[in-house]
Amino acid sequence: MTDRKLALEAWESLFRAQHELFTEMVKDFDDAHLSQAEYDVLLTVTRSPSRTARLRDVTANMLISQPSVSRLVDRMVTRGLVAKCADPDDGRGALISATDAGTRAFRTLAMVHGRSIADRMSHLEDDELRALRDLAEKLRRG
């Protein structure tokens, strides 16, 4: 049986670490040409086959809360970061594709953001990083 006090301490520590890391990492976006939410959309889209994803998958994979992903995507279309078209397999759905400009903007910021993440995590050993990843996945699965 899980020790309730220990569970609460672990939860608080995890939440505080996430908050502090996020507060620090948000600085990566200060001079960027992408918002955090736009980066998040492009993260999902650029990792998808042919740099194309269903809008519902983009919404489900958002790491940052976004009340209206559809409106965000429409703004990104206007900026030339993504293209949006009807999903031929789902009449009500849409497909989102990263444009070359969107892919370039994403990769530029991803290099900066990736360095920040690597720097912040560098005080952990590889086995600790694997354990952290595995524990986080276990928590997500419930």
Model-derived regions: residue spans:
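N-terminal helix-turn-helix DNA-binding core of bacterial DNA-binding proteins
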Residues: T23-S65
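Charged, amphipathic alpha-helical coiled-coil/dimerization segments
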Residues: F22, D74-E137
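Alpha-helical hairpin
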Residues: D3-L6, L34-Q36, A98, L124
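N-terminal leader segment of winged-helix/HTH proteins
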Residues: M1-A32, R79-L81, K138
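Short amphipathic alpha-helical segments with heptad-repeat character
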Residues: W11-F15, H19, L63, T103, ...
